[in-house]
Structures are given as C-alpha cells and as structure tokens.
C-alpha cells in the first residue's frame, strides 16, 4: 500500500493539518463566494495550502474578472486580511519592488501591492510569485514575476528533491513536477494526468519502471504536499476515502 510506504518518512502533526484544511475549505465554500441573483461575484482558487498558510488566486467577476494573488494565515482566515510579503520574508517590500521593476511601466493605473503574492510550483519546488495588476484599454490585465526569496519554513516545512530537477527532466521530458520523500527512497513525478512513483537511491532513480501509477483529473494541480509516519498514514487514508478518494493498493 503506497500510504504505508510513507511510514518511514518525516513526522508531521497531521491532525493539525486536517483541522486547518477543514477550516480553509469551510472558509472558501461559505464566505469567499458572494451570491447576487445566484451568480458568484468573487471566485477563489487554492494554489497552495500548508499547516499555517493558504495561497489563493481571487477573481473579481464584477470587476472585469480582475485576478489577484493572496496569502492568508489560517489562524485568522476569517478576518479576510491577506498578509504582506514583508510579514513572512525579510526585506519583503524591497524584494517585491525589485522583482516588479521591469513591468511597473505597463498600461494605466499600475497597482503595486506587496500583498499581491502567492505560492506556485516550478521545477519541483514551491516558489514565491508576485503580481502587478494594470488596466489597458479598459481591460483588467496582470503580469507575474518571481520573487528572489525562499518560502520560509513556517510556510513550507519540507521542499527538497533527492534527485536534481535537471536529471528528472532529462529522464522524463514530459514531466511537469516532482516530489521526493524525505528519506530519499522514492520520488513522485507528475506526467500529464498521472502521478508516477519511482524508487530512488543515492540521488538517482533506481529504475524507470514505476512502482505505481495514479490517475489524476486533466488540468489538476498540486496544492499540498505532506509526509507522515506512524498511525497518520492510516488516518489520512481513511479520511480521504471517506471524502471520495480511491483506495490505491
């Protein structure tokens, strides 16, 4: 059973994760969508969720579909107050301005707001991304840019690859993302609509024959990565199956 293989990985307080995840889902489903004549005016898509933070992309339907990025601390998510980059990263204001410098001259009414940040996946890692919104010919547009800072441990507790991304992309040209187990014994490679799991040893993929393949929906995206041991794999497996997930042997 794939979940049982996780027993040898890093310990996590998974009960806290489940509690925070339930809180975030409740917030998104109950408070983040305002209905007017049965039509949503604000949509929120999850980009990342961890033990303490959630990153979303917000679409304001009644404002020409303006799209912004926001990060919330789960402890006070009900306050609807996104955090600023400088709240989580040293010199955050400077790093935001530095990253956006080349695109600040775009269009009209450029909005520079260091709360307009999010977490996304790139080359097997979580990275911080900033966004600038602007108007052009009355159209709401935006440009994204990378922020030269590593997400803090309070946001992403484990984010390592036991196999270098260059080697992964060379062996799997169609691979779009990858996750390594903390004990370095296996790697999950995302290819098209599949999670493919491979054994690894000493920073190399042991065999190109996958241990297992797991189908995922088309255009699905990874928003969370957690590792567990002890009783937590079984707890999470049972909880996910209750929510409609497949039991994978």
Regions found by a protein language model. Give the residues of each.
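A broadly tuned "polar low-complexity/structure-edge" signature
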Residues: 3, 52-57, 196-197
